[in-house]
Amino acid sequence: MKKSLVAVVLALSAAACAQEQGMKSEWQLGYGKTFYAPNNGMAALYIIRDESNPDTSLIDITMGRESVGTLAGPGWMRVDLPPSYYDLRAYGTEGSRELVVTVNAGESRFFLAQSSTPPGNAQLVEILQPEGRRLVRQSPRIYSNPSLP
């Protein structure tokens, strides 16, 4: 009796695990990742590298003198920052481009890290929220430097 009870429990557990993905509604499957509001008094910056770009060279992102992180392929990073202006740079294998941004409390902004001309350079380009959210949903998260302000 105990053996059959254990077998039934194991079978039901396996069935429940297998159905977990299928139990999501169409809305949940379509929405994907949740975009949390920035922390109180902070702004959220998303830095994204798109997978449609065939160039796989490293792009290093810095803010002032601090490294934010490196994007080697498709992925995204989120940085929560207090309101201020920031000097962001995207470094390719040969050079970099600067982008100075001003952020306000409560806002979320999206930036695309991409290769630029001449070859070996990289740049950050601000994109609209719907496009940024779509790209974030398609890519894995890459954790950024936790010691940033």
Where are these regions (language model features)?
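Sec-dependent bacterial lipoprotein signal peptides
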Residues: 1-17
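Short loop/turn and low-complexity linker motifs enriched in small/turn-promoting residues
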Residues: 17-149
